[in-house]
Structure formats: structure tokens, C-alpha cells
């Protein structure tokens, strides 16, 4: 049974989400307190849905603490913060989805189901186990990236995006296709999702002096993973 943690200081939202997810067969743990959420973080949690604006401890703080604990729990922000810069910042923290209030509980359940299904499919896929490019090695089963035998920390979505691009080396892939194949939805309001993740991947490759290959922006069309010119 999938263990879901819901964190929101609005009890009515917590209650309705709990009702919907328990009906879907989830084991649900809830709290309306950010401080309490910090105590509930553990490897026993399979996925987390959390608000951002909460007294004392925000949704940002909870995610940062999760990273400090070296937990890799997929999470969805459910928030009234609707500005583009809010979405971008949440994605830089590694959010797997960003849903704005007011929201449809049914849509939230479906998005969560789809996220978990993609993760399960990705984790159990053995069609291609490994890609290698002049010292860069991507291992699909373990979701790890190494450069010259040094493992580079990556969030799951960063890895999946790089894997998708690298597995189609030299091809131009549109943002809409990347959104559909990596995130599982075609949501143009969140087109910056791809930009943010591409930027973070490039930073990691450059930080570790990986120069033979690069992710190239093809203006008006998309991105491609190719040998550096």
C-alpha cells in the first residue's frame, strides 16, 4: 500500500484530500503543522503532497530538511502561490508537480497516480540499462549518473530528462514532448519546467568539467543532446 503524507495548514483541504486518497487505496498520514511534518519525514513515506505557505515551517523548509536527511521522497506542491517565479523556485527544489489552488481533488489523485505509475515503470524498465558517452555513464535501473567514475547527485526528474535526451542523441526534442514523456502531461502553463531542469543538468555537467557532449537549445524547436562542436 502506498504511504502518502499530506501537509497543509487548512484542515478542510487535508480532510478532503485524505478522503479521496483513502478511497483510492492509499495509506494516508496527515498533519496541519509544518513542525510536525518534519518529525514525520522518513523512508516509510512513498510520496508527499504539501502546501508552501504555512506558519513557522514552510513547505520549502520541509523539502530542504528532507534533502538534509538524504531522503528522496517524490513530492507535489499544492499551493495558492500562483506566480511564475513561485513555480520556478519550487521546481528548482525538485518538485515533481505543482498544483495551484483552488484545485480539483480528483485531478490531484490522478496526477499522483500517474506520477507513481511513471516512477514504477521507469524503475522496472530493463529495455536499456546503460548509456555511455566519453566518460559519462547513465545507469537506468539505479538512476545514477557518473562522470569519470564519480557519481553525480541528481533528482529523479533530472535523471529522467537527461536519459530521455541522451537515449535519442542528436535528435531535436520539443518541450511539449519532454513534458509528456518525462512528466506525463501536456501543460503549457508549466513550460518553464523543462527550462529549469535543463539549466540544472547543464550546471552539473559543467561543474564536473564534462565537455565532450552538451545539451543544445534549438531555438523555437526544443533541445538535443549532442557532441560538443
From Swiss-Prot:
Record-given protein name: Response regulator SaeR
Record flagged with keyword Cytoplasm: yes
Post-translational modification remark: Phosphorylated by SaeS.
One annotated Gene Ontology cellular component of this protein: protein-DNA complex
Biological role stated in the UniProt entry: Member of the two-component regulatory system SaeR/SaeS. Probably functions as a transcriptional regulator via a specific DNA-binding domain, recognizing motifs near the promoter sequences of target genes.
A Gene Ontology biological process term: regulation of DNA-templated transcription
Record bears the keyword Phosphoprotein: yes
Keywords of this entry: Cytoplasm, DNA-binding, Phosphoprotein, Sensory transduction, Transcription, Transcription regulation, Two-component regulatory system
Predominant location: cytoplasm
Residues modified as 4-aspartylphosphate: 51
GO molecular function: phosphorelay response regulator activity; transcription cis-regulatory region binding
Classification via SMART domains: REC (SM00448), Trans_reg_C (SM00862)
Domain of life: Bacteria
Domain Response regulatory, chain residue ranges per copy: 3-116
UniProt-listed Pfam families: Response_reg, Trans_reg_C
DNA-binding region (UniProt annotation): 128-227
Subcellular localization: Cytoplasm
Amino acid at each position: 500500500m502506498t504511504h502518502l503524507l499530506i501537509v497543509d495548514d487548512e484542515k478542510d483541504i487535508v480532510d478532503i484530500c485524505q478522503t479521496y486518497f483513502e478511497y483510492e487505496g492509499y495509506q494516508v498520514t496527515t498533519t496541519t503543522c509544518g513542525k510536525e511534518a518534519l518529525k514525520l519525514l522518513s523512508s516509510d513515506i512513498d510520496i508527499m503532497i504539501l502546501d508552501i505557505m504555512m506558519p513557522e515551517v514552510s513547505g520549502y523548509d520541509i523539502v530542504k530538511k528532507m534533502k538534509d536527511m538524504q531522503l528522496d521522497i517524490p513530492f507535489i506542491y499544492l499551493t495558492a502561490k500562483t506566480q511564475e517565479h513561485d513555480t520556478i523556485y519550487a521546481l528548482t527544489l525538485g518538485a515533481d508537480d505543482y498544483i495551484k489552488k483552488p484545485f480539483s481533488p480528483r485531478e490531484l489523485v490522478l496526477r499522483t497516480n500517474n506520477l507513481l505509475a511513471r516512477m514504477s515503470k521507469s524503475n522496472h524498465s530493463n529495455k536499456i540499462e546503460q548509456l555511455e558517452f566519453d566518460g559519462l555513464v547513465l545507469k537506468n535501473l539505479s538512476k545514477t549518473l557518473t562522470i569519470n567514475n564519480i557519481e553525480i547527485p541528481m533528482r529523479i526528474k533530472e535523471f529522467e530528462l537527461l536519459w530521455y535526451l541522451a537515449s535519442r542523441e542528436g535528435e531535436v526534442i520539443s518541450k511539449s514532448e519532454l513534458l509528456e514523456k518525462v512528466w506525463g502531461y501536456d501543460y503549457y502553463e508549466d513550460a518553464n519546467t523543462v527550462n529549469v531542469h535543463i539549466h540544472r543538468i547543464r550546471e552539473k555537467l559543467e561543474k564536473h568539467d564534462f565537455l565532450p557532449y552538451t545539451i543544445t537549445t534549438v531555438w523555437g524547436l526544443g533541445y538535443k543532446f549532442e557532441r560538443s562542436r
